[in-house]
Amino acid sequence: VPPHQLSVAVVSGCRSAVGALRHPPPTCEHLPVTLPDLLTTFAPLDLGGGFTLRAVDVADAPALAALVRANSAHLGRFIPAVVATIVDDESAVRHCREMQRLQSTGELLEMHLFDGDVLCGSVRMRDVDGRNRSAYIGYFIGTDHQGRGLVTLAVGAFVEWAFSSLQLHRIGLRCVAANTASAAVAHRLGFTLEGRLRDCELIDGVFHDDLVFSRLSSDRVGPH
């Protein structure tokens, strides 16, 4: 299940590469440092002001389920799969365990955003491709915490961590074109708009375009 990015305003997702039949599946094994290695010593990212990004933990499953339920109307606008998958504490536990399994193989890393002890959002890096030193990022935040710059803060810190710790070269990001808030986050963080995928997502019987962004480790990015 790809939690992309939530909030009534902020939802961004990421998909696997289409060339799976032509190329080997992405793996982090060619990176100088792999996700499994990093996670053995991973410490929460302190964002300041009492906000932290922490690796996914099964103990946080009830809080994750509550967050998705409370924001289901907003999530459903752009990423209905999240609402359909995380429906209660039990399904949230399954999700967290699957995320941990995939993290142990280096395929992705999901972090949860906390305001003190309150889980208020999520940031995920997936499709980690060590051969090409690339990955995709997605994120969401609850409506109670939107409008405060927290998505920009959290995703920005996560991106910098991924570039420096994993030595990635490229991070991609996709969001529904109608989600102007998510696109604004991408622009603020120095992502370049690469193109538009027409009618690529069917949500509630309506086709939507996706915007495709990327940022390179060599890009010059000013303050957010």
Predicted regions and their residues:
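Generic, well-ordered alpha-helical segments
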Residues: 56, 67, 84-91, 105
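Short amphipathic alpha-helical segments enriched in hydrophobics
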Residues: 68-72, 79, 103
